[in-house]
C-alpha cells in the first residue's frame, strides 16, 4: 500500500514573482529561457512548474502572449510531462478578467489561488478581492484546473477553508 509519508512533489518557480537578472543573471526572462529552465527542472525531478512571465524589460507582467509562448514551448517537448501552474498574480491592481483569461485559453493543470490580500515586502499590495477569489474558484471547477492554495499568513487559512466550502 502506498502512503503519502514517502511521497514528494517538487515544484519550481524558475522566474518567480520578483527576481530580475540584476538579482541573479540566471533568472530566465524570455519565453524561450523560461521554457528551457522548466525543461531542465523537469529533467532534475520537478513535477510542477509555477509560471510567471516578464515584459521585454524584465518586469513582472500578465501578458497573455508571453504565457501562451511559454506554454506552447513547454508542451511542444513531448517527452516533458511537467504539470503547469500559471500564476494569477494579484500585484498591480490587475483586472480580474486579465488574471483568469490565461487559464481559460491555456488550460494548465494548476493555477495559483492566493487566499487573501497582503503587503508584499515594502513595495506592493498583493490584492485578492473576495469577488476575485470566488470567481477564480468557480473558474477552476469549470475548467478542471486544480488550485494551488497559497497561504501567506494565518488569516488566509480561514479564507481558504471558507472558499473550499
Predicted segment positions?
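Active-site mouth loops of central-metabolism enzymes
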Residues: 14-36, 87-96, 122-126
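Conserved, mostly hydrophobic/aromatic
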Residues: 34, 41, 52, 111, ...
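Extended substrate/RNA-proximal surfaces in nucleic-acid metabolism proteins
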Residues: 93-149
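Glycine-rich, proline-tolerant flexible connector loops at the mouths of alpha/beta enzymes
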Residues: 22, 47-70, 120
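Alpha-helix-loop-beta-strand connector modules within alpha/beta enzyme cores
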Residues: 12, 59-86, 134-142
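N-terminal small/glycine-rich loop or linker at the start of catalytic domains
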Residues: 1-26, 112-119
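Hydrophobic faces of well-ordered beta-strands that scaffold small-molecule active sites
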Residues: 10-14, 49-51, 82-88, 109-113, ...
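Acidic (Asp/Glu)-rich catalytic clusters
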Residues: 3-5, 42-43, 75-79, 100-109, ...
Amino acid at each position: 500500500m502506498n502512503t503519502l509519508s514517502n511521497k514528494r512533489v517538487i515544484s519550481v518557480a524558475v522566474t518567480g514573482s520578483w527576481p530580475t537578472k540584476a538579482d541573479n543573471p540566471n533568472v530566465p526572462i524570455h519565453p524561450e529561457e523560461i521554457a528551457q529552465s522548466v525543461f531542465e527542472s523537469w529533467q532534475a525531478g520537478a513535477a510542477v512548474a509555477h509560471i510567471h512571465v516578464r515584459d521585454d524589460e524584465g518586469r513582472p507582467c500578465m501578458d497573455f502572449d508571453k504565457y501562451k509562448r511559454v506554454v506552447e514551448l513547454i508542451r511542444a517537448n513531448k517527452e516533458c510531462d511537467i504539470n503547469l501552474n500559471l500564476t494569477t498574480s494579484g500585484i498591480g491592481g490587475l483586472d480580474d478578467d486579465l488574471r483568469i483569461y490565461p487559464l481559460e485559453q491555456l488550460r494548465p493543470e494548476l493555477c495559483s489561488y492566493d487566499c487573501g490580500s497582503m503587503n508584499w515586502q515594502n513595495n506592493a499590495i498583493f490584492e485578492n478581492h473576495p469577488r476575485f477569489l470566488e470567481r477564480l474558484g468557480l473558474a477552476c471547477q469549470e475548467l478542471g484546473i486544480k488550485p494551488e492554495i497559497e497561504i501567506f499568513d494565518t488569516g488566509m487559512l480561514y479564507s481558504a477553508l471558507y472558499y473550499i466550502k
